[in-house]
Design a protein with these regions (language model features):
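Nucleotide-activated sugar donor-binding and catalytic core shared by glycosyltransferases
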Residues: 1-11, 15-34, 38-49, 107, ...
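Residues at the starts of beta-strands that form the adenosine-phosphate
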Residues: 30, 49, 127, 216, ...
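Conserved nucleotide-sugar phosphate-binding/catalytic loop shared by glycosyltransferases and other
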Residues: 34-78, 151-153
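Short loop/helix-cap segments at secondary-structure boundaries that form the rim of catalytic
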Residues: 39-46, 119-123, 141, 192, ...
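Short gly/pro/ser/thr-enriched loop/turn and capping motifs at secondary-structure boundaries
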Residues: 40-41, 57-61, 134-141, 145, ...
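Conserved nucleotide-sugar donor-interacting segment of glycosyltransferase catalytic cores
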Residues: 88-159, 204-205
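Donor-nucleotide binding loops and adjacent catalytic segments primarily
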Residues: 201-312
Length: 411
């Protein structure tokens, strides 16, 4: 079969696509990966055919993007952010996907490109599968992750999800239909209830909702690349790790574009005074500053290698980082910024493998100091190891997703 795997976003949004595409290719299928250009190096190493979507995700998620800044400051997705992405890219994304899907049997698309992919699938008469890195189906069990809120009463969760879905649907259909008119095509016909959904998260972290009504949902587990057996840490990192007790990892991945980040970083470092720590630079270049001897700056390192070697993990709770943290057996100090991050932070806390999430806008050295003392208690560490063992017993996510896609296509 010829399969298109498509998505857009930060590193945490892109690596699952790479993992799924590589799994499908290993299974003997012809695969085209449609994603941000930042996937180029790893896609090349894995021999994947990458088609680059116009518009760099990294440039969108910076201080130069008013929508991103507003989203991060409010903690909730700003329609201005979606407007920027859609206004700049709709026509180009449809054209890129259309070329990639020539001769394809199925498109597997994640949230930001699922409407564009539906447009192409409709025009070519091919199947579409919706890959979700965070849940969007209505349920009483929890609020919609992209609402940026947690702790809402059950009766409110379904109406809130309906509102978010309806708003997004109206917005995206309008943009897609304008592009289709320009291309001489009829209006988009998309029936969500007919789409097979692959839920790319651990059922230990988030079990199936008790009241989902969608007829075709498969929780596959997270889509992750295998560990790289050839990766070796830089000498300075290896020496730092060997020179004392396990450090506390601090990193916010793709979070960038907020002037307050350096202030929050300083509060965290002050709160960890007297403890060994690793500070990951990330997109915001957080480690580009003078640091105390107890804090070691690092660039990129595989989470599945570094996290198990740490005493705790301070992170933003993106879906990918959340899964890697839970799998590592190391407890977390969640500092969620917005989007779906408060949702995943709340999941870690409710599982007993993280402190109560810290609002970055209220972070102080005292708050961090108390969280570090809490998260390193033996009972929290034991619970983190227990959850890691439960996740390790789950089926492999990309293998399960590959099987589900083939079933969808009648194979």
């Amino acid at each position: 079969m010829r399969i298109v795997v498509a998505g857009y976003g930060s590193t945490g949004d892109t690596l699952p696509l790479v993992a799924l595409a590589a799994s499908l290719q290993r299974a003997g299928h012809s695969v085209v990966l449609v994603a941000d250009g930042a996937a180029g190096q790893i896609a090349g190493r894995l021999g994947l055919d990458l088609r680059v979507l116009p518009g760099s995700a990294r440039s969108m998620l910076t201080v130069g993007s008013p929508g991103w800044s507003r989203t991060m400051k409010s903690g909730r997705p700003s329609m201005q952010l979606f407007a920027e992405v859609t206004r700049l890219n709709t026509r180009g994304w449809i054209e890129t996907l259309d070329a990639a899907a020539e001769g394809a049997d199925v498109i597997v698309a994640t949230t930001l490109v699922v409407y564009h992919s539906a447009s192409v699938a409709q025009e070519k008469g091919i199947r579409l599968v919706f890959g979700q890195l965070q849940p969007s189906l209505e349920t009483r069990d929890y609020p919609p992750p992209l609402s940026g809120v947690v702790g809402t009463p059950g009766w409110l969760n379904r109406p809130l999800a309906d509102l978010i879905s309806a708003t997004g649907d109206l917005f995206y259909r309008s943009a897609i239909n304008k592009a289709r008119r320009d291309l001489g095509q009829p209006r988009l016909q998309l029936a969500w209830e007919a789409l097979p959904i692959l839920a790319a998260w651990s059922p230990t972290l988030l079990p199936a909702a008790s009241d989902w009504t969608h007829p075709n949902v498969t929780i596959t587990g997270p889509w992750q690349l295998p560990s790289d057996p050839d990766w070796q840490p830089p000498n300075d990192l290896a020496e730092f790790l060997a020179d004392g007790e396990p450090p506390i990892y601090v990193g916010f991945g793709s979070m960038a574009g907020l002037g307050e980040l350096s202030t929050w970083r300083d509060a965290i470092i002050q709160g960890l005074a007297g403890r060994r720590a690793l500070l990951s630079s990330g997109w915001a270049a957080l480690a580009d500053t003078d640091l105390p001897d107890t804090v070691h700056p690092i660039g990129w390192a595989p989470h599945d290698w570094i996290f198990p070697r740490c005493a705790a993990i301070v992170h933003h709770c993106g879906a990918g980082t959340t899964h890697q943290a839970a799998q590592s057996g190391t407890p977390s100090i969640p500092v969620p910024f917005g989007m779906d991050q408060p949702f995943w932070a709340d999941r870690l806390y409710k599982l007993g493998i993280a402190t109560r999430p810290i609002n970055p806008r209220k972070i102080t050295s005292e708050v961090v100091r108390a969280a570090a003392a809490e998260v390193t208690r033996p009972e929290v560490t034991r619970k983190a190891l227990e959850i890691a063992q439960r996740i390790a017993s789950e089926p492999d996510g990309v293998t399960a997703a590959t099987s589900a896609i083939l079933r969808t296509c009648g194979l």
